[in-house]
Amino acid sequence: MEENFTRQKVDTLNITIYAEQDSKPTAAQLNLQPFAEEKDNRRLNFKAKDIGLVNNPKQSDLAIVIAPEENKAANELAEKLLNNQNLRLRITTGYDNVFEKVSEIATELEKALELGLEITDFMQIYRRGITMDKVEHQLAIFTNGIAKINMDRPAVIGDGITLLQKEEATALANFFDTKKENYKLKKFVPASGAATRMFKFLHDFMSGYNPEKETINGYTNRVKDNSLQVFLLGQEKFPFYKEIATVAEKLIKCPDMENENLREDARHYSFVKTMISEEYFDYANKPKGILPFHDYDGFAATPVYEHLKEAAAYASSKGETHVHFTISENHLNGFLDAINDARAKVEAETGIKIHFNFTYQLKETDTLAVGLDNKPFREEKTKLLFRPGGHGALIENLNRLDADVVFIKNIDNVRHTKMDTITLYKKALAGILVKLQEKVFKYLEDIESGKINEAELDEIIRFAEQELSLDISPDFDKFTLENKYQYVKEQLNRPIRVCGMVKNEGEPGGGPFWVKGKRGRLSLQIVESSQIDLDNKIQSHIFSQSTHFNPVDLVCGLKDYKGNKFDLSEYVDANTGFIVQKNRMGKEVKSYELPGLWNGAMAGWVTVFVEVPLKTFNPVKTVNDLLKPAHQKPA
């Protein structure tokens, strides 16, 4: 290399291709490709080497080792290149694809250099599977910011939200039961989040309380938070009480065991410490999904158990059910233990065969962190900082499922024993989805086969407006007949989601609104408070008038009228999302969270909102929520 390429003054960037076969013709062909822009005065120079003939690989700006994964010589060479501080990529691909693969890498490398990134940056980004187009988009978002959502009005009963009487819900649930054998059903449960916030007030207690200087009562009066008192008064009602108390009793340290008040404080302190400290139960660092939530005769049930039981009740067909959890890779073993234990119990109770699988949040959905200057943040001289993309990244996990109908629900929204209402309304939402799909699919098939005349198009438009809440273009009547067909097809041929909404009782989070898009068209969206300009009096007023809340209770149709899977990435509003500022190593950094799974990630879906009873919403946001009736053993 003739000059420091990291400063973008490179004349020639040398790239060596290592493969098992003769790749010199490929290198020659690559050297004819115009990868670099002439204005940069930069050229990529490709050379080829046989893996088996290389003992001491020479330094190059980038080494690409291409061979099957099990190729020992290739793996040894890759390791040797790494030890020699050679920048290298280890690529697993067939030899027939060498030209295409290296061309792809070279194109991405050029884009990285165009963005002012260094080659070491490119390596880290490419290995994660992140494209340079995504990086460019993310950097532009940091520079330009994210526009706030423009709400037109809240969705309410009769204007965006359908009210279901119990008789209607029962009829829809029965309808779904008659149809479900024709569908691949799956339950999708985001479950990767740790329980840190669930125990936050207990962490605050452990760090802020000094047993040698004050009583617990004095601490609670000082911090003016009764959460700890509620926890301690109700501790014997928690399903984990006996197990933790048995260990905690042995660890009590009290200077005066004869003093009842001091002894009681010491007992409480030991219980909390045993529950959340790393050396004992470490509950705060475990996922919510595998913690004991409910006390049953003979065992404590985890959310995993409750979700499997729910799946057997409303997401089963032909005597089996399929459940998919998105989890943190670090907690795989804990989930496997929890699921295998729960599966045996639920199968014995219900007679339903349970199939389950996991995915992790994909590394390719991580986003690049930047400093306050909007330049990539480096933890060390060359190490970029990547952050998880938030739950919106799970649209990629959802996109990989093979299912017709998918039930989505958060891991912490479960209840003890009584599931009749939950089951009824989940099936009712699925019944609505199936009914709507049957109509949509019939219309699309008829349009494709030429069976729809212009008068019948008006019927379809009425259906789209009244039952799908679609905002049809006011210029529709001016379209040519051919354009009308195309427009209707584009409006209908999209994934459908039917979302349960509960009456707003002050819970934090998103709600249902009519939102104006770029061209002034309205659509139903689930909007988070962080997406709204609350300093704008009109928008703040609209937000305050919301009557319903999003409990994350969705039933989704993932296939089109021909039985093909939709590419869900095509329906994401990439201009939404969240910029989050955090401290890293004493420095402020910004990260971009992708559009939320049920927010911008599904912005382009056909959306139907339906009111469901508050009984179906029983989240556990803090450990004290487990003391509520929905989480206690019925009397």
Regions found by a protein language model. Give the residues of each.
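Ser/Thr/Gly-rich flexible loops in soluble cytosolic domains mediating phosphotransfer, phosphorylation
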Residues: A78-L113
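Short, well-ordered secondary-structure micro-motifs within conserved domains or adaptor modules
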Residues: I51-K72
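Low-complexity, highly charged intrinsically disordered N-terminal segments
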Residues: K111-I161, L291-D295, K318-I327
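Conserved catalytic alpha/beta cores of large enzymes that bind or transform nucleotide phosphates
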Residues: D412, K427-Q466, F543-A635
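Structural motif
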Residues: Y18-S23, V65-E70, T93-Y95, I327-N330
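Non-Sec secretion/translocation targeting segments of pathogen effectors
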Residues: M1-E3
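A short, well-structured beta->alpha microelement
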Residues: Q33-K58
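Domain-scale recognition of functional cores that engage charged ligands
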Residues: P154-F199, H203-E505, G509-I526, S530-D535, ...
